[in-house]
C-alpha cells in the first residue's frame, strides 16, 4: 500500500520471484503489510513461498475510523472543547517525527494524510497524554448516549439470531 491507495496483489501476474527459492528449500519470503489485501490473496501468497505475512496498520486504521465516527456523533451532541480530530491535528502538527518522512504533498494533502493515510502514522500519537485526554473527553461526551443507542439496538435484536 501507499499512503493514499492500496495496490492489490495480482494473483494472475507471472510468478518470477518464487523460482529463486527452488535451490533454497529452507527459505521463504516475507510479505510486508498484507492486512489491506483481499482474503483470496493469501493462499496465492503462500503458494509463492511467502510464508511470513506481516500485518501493518489496518487495525489501528479501523480504530481511528471508529473514533472519528464517534467524534462526528459528539459534534452533533454539542461537545464542549475541540474535536478529537482537532486535538490530534494539534498534536501531530506540533511533533512531526512520526509522519514527516512518510508523507509528501501540499499542506492540505499532508493534513489529510496525517488523519486518513493508509500508513496510519497517527497510531504513534494515541499513547500521548493529550490524545488520551481527547479520547476520554470524547467518551465523556458520549456517555449515556451510546448506551441508550445500544439498548435500543438490543431490544430490536431480542429474539433474533445474531449473524
In which residue ranges do the predicted regions lie?
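Active-site-proximal beta-alpha loop/turn segments in soluble metabolic enzymes
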Residues: 1-6
